[in-house]
A protein has these predicted regions:
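Transmembrane helix recognition focused on a "late"/terminal membrane span
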Residues: 2-22, 45-139
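Membrane interfacial helix-start motif at the N-side
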Residues: 9-14, 24-44
């Protein structure tokens, strides 16, 4: 008997385009999991990213902007910008509504910036998870 060469999605997972799932996962944290029928996991991801992002805003954390300079400064600024942008709609709404904090000295501001970055990095992990589920590499 010949085995099927392609990996089929489990019966509980609706067939969705992996690119659509990836885009929705970026735009709305946990949204890709909702599309795939994983509502519990999607809600947990949404709340985790939202709480982390909200704490960062409440601590008046500065969002990274792409700036050039020496190699380390450029790497930190662009990496932080990508991580902030990975928060999806939360980042876009905060920028569109005019949130802008200057990078200033202080522990709470520094922690706030780290919470904003952590929210984006957590959403990147969720995007990878949703991608793997939608392509059948993970149950």
């Amino acid at each position: 008997m010949a085995q099927a060469s392609s990996q089929a999605l489990p019966a509980s997972t609706p067939a969705r385009s992996p690119y659509l799932v990836l885009f929705v996962s970026w735009l709305i944290p946990g949204g890709g999991h909702f599309l795939l029928g994983r509502r519990g996991r999607g809600a947990i991801i949404f709340l985790a990213v939202l709480v982390s992002f909200a704490f960062g805003l409440m601590m008046r954390g500065a969002m990274f902007q792409p700036k050039s300079g020496d190699l380390l400064t450029t790497l930190i600024q662009y990496g932080g910008f990508v991580a902030d942008l990975a928060s999806g709609l939360f980042y876009l709404l905060s920028v569109w509504l005019g949130y802008s904090q200057e990078d200033m000295a202080g522990h709470s501001h520094d922690y706030g910036a780290k919470f904003l970055v952590a929210a984006g990095l957590l959403n990147i992990l969720a995007m990878v998870d949703a991608w793997e589920i939608s392509t059948g590499k993970k149950d």
